[in-house]
Amino acid sequence: MDPLKSIVQDQHVILTLPSGNSKIVELKPDSSVSLGKFGAFQVNDILGWPLGTTFEIYYDNVEEIVENKKKKPKSNELNKVPVGKVRLYKEVATDDKAEEEVEEMDSSAVIPVELQNVLSSATNQGLINIGNDVQKLTMHDVERFKQQSASANEIITKMIESHGSFHQKTIYSQEKYLKRKKQKFAKFFTVDYLSSSMLLKFLVEKGDIQRVLDLSEESLGMILNLTNIRSDGTYLCMDETGGLIVYTMLERMFGGKEDLDAPGKIVVINENEHPNLDLLKFSNYSEKFIEKHVVTLSILDYFRPPTMEEVEGRFTPLSKEEVNKLKSGKRSAYSRKLKWYYTQLRVIEMATKQQYDGLVVASTLHLPSLVPRLAERVHGARPIVCFSQFKETLLELAHTLYSDLRYLAPTILETRCRPYQTARGKLHPLMTMRGGGGYLLWCHRVIPAPEPEIEEPTDVNADEQEEKKQKME
C-alpha cells in the first residue's frame, strides 16, 4: 500500500479530534491508541483505509464495561480508557423532502440536519436566562446514555428536546450550541497524512512557537518557492527549527517517496556538536534514506575544514590483505578509524569542492557576518533565502549584501494570510488568529565580471592628433 494515500503500519499520522485539537501518533500494529475522553481504538482496525477517512468509536460490550468500572481497578488501570471498535463516521442523513428544500435554499442559509425540525426565533429578545434549570436532562442521565453506548447524535438530540428555551434561540445561536455539544460528546476522529505544514500547525497550536522561530505556514511555502527546490539539487541549509525546514525540503524534493538512487542532497550546517533534527522522526523516512540524502556538518568544520595532508597524516587505509591479518580487536578499532577517515573526506568535499544550488538560513546567529561566508560555495545565479523573526536583523543583512557585488537585489518580504470568519450577513477577520510569522530576505548569488582595462593612448594616435591640429591651423 502507498503510505501517501493509505493508512499503513509503523507510520506517523495526525489525528483531528472533535474538539479541534490534534494528536500525533505512531501506528504500531497490535496496539491501541487512547484519545482521552473521546475513547480508544485498536490500530489494526484502521489499517488499509485511505488517509483522510473519519472514524467513529463505539462500544458493543457496554455491560462488561460497566461491571469492570464497579470492580476495584488495579493501580495500572486507574486511568485506562476502555478500547472500543471503530466504524466509518457518517453524518445524519436527511430525507428526500429536506434535501430538496436544502437545494432550493441559498448556500449561505443551509441549516444543519439536526436543526431542520426545530423551531427558532428571529431574535433572542424572548430568551430568559434562568441558568441550568432550563435543561431538564441531568448529567446522570447523560452518563447513563453514554454507558448505554448511545451515539453523540442521539445524546445531542435528547438534550435539544429537553431544553426548555431552545426554540427561542436564533438559528445562529442554535448552530453554536450544536457545535459545542458535538465537540464535547462526539467520538470521531480523522486520520490525515503528517505533512510538514500539518506538523507546523500542530507545533503552533501546542505552543512551541519559539521552537520553530515563529515560522508561519505562508513563510514556509515562500522559502520553498524562492529557493527553487528541485529533486536533483544540492542545497546548503542552516536549520534551527528542529528539522522542520529540512523535512519540508525533503517533501518537495522526493514527494514523500524513498528513492535511494535519487541524486538530491541537503547539507545541514549546525552550530552545536550534534545537529538538532528531532522533527525528522515524524517524516516517515527511514534512517538509511535520511543518512544518504541529509549530510550534517558542524559550522567549525565548514569554515575551517581539515586538509588532505592532515587527514592522511593521522590515518592511512590498509589493503585487504593487511586487514585480514589483523586480530578481531584491532580490526574493530581499524573499522572505527576507517569510518572517521571517510567522514573527513566527505567534510573536505562538502566544504571546499561542492557547489550548491541554493542556500537556506533560519538561524539566531548574527546573519550579516554569517551569510556572506556561507554563500561563498553557492553557485552563480542561485537563490539565497534567509528567515528571521525580526525585521531589524534582515535590514542589517540587506545593507551588508547591498555593498557586495556578489549578491543581486536583496529583497525583504513579509507574508500574511488572514482567515475570515463568516456568518449570515457578517464577514470579519478571525478574532483569534495569531500574529507574527517572521520575515524573509531573498537575493541571488552572482559572479561579477572583471572590470575592463582602460587602454592608454598610443604614440600613433598622438601623431594623428598633431596632424589634425596643423591642418586646422
From Swiss-Prot:
Which Pfam families does UniProt cross-reference here? Gcd10p (PF04189)
Question: Domain of life, per the record?
Answer: Eukaryota
User: Tell me, what is an example of a GO biological process annotation in this record?
Assistant: tRNA methylation
Region described as Disordered: 452-473
Compositional bias (Acidic residues) spans?
A: 452-465
Keywords, sorted A to Z: Nucleus, RNA-binding, tRNA processing
Q: Does the keyword DNA repair apply?
A: no
GO cellular component terms attached to this protein's record: nucleus; tRNA (m1A) methyltransferase complex
Q: InterPro entries attached here?
A: TRM6 (IPR017423)
- The main place the protein resides is nucleus
Question: Does the UniProt entry include the keyword rRNA-binding?
Answer: no
What role is this protein assigned? Answer: Substrate-binding subunit of tRNA (adenine-N(1)-)-methyltransferase, which catalyzes the formation of N(1)-methyladenine at position 58 (m1A58) in initiator methionyl-tRNA.
- Protein family according to the UniProt entry: Belongs to the TRM6/GCD10 family.
**What is said about its interaction partners and assembly?**
Heterotetramer; composed of two copies of TRM6 and two copies of TRM61.
**Protein name per the record:** tRNA (adenine(58)-N(1))-methyltransferase non-catalytic subunit TRM6
Organism encoding this protein: Candida glabrata (strain ATCC 2001 / BCRC 20586 / JCM 3761 / NBRC 0622 / NRRL Y-65 / CBS 138) (Yeast)
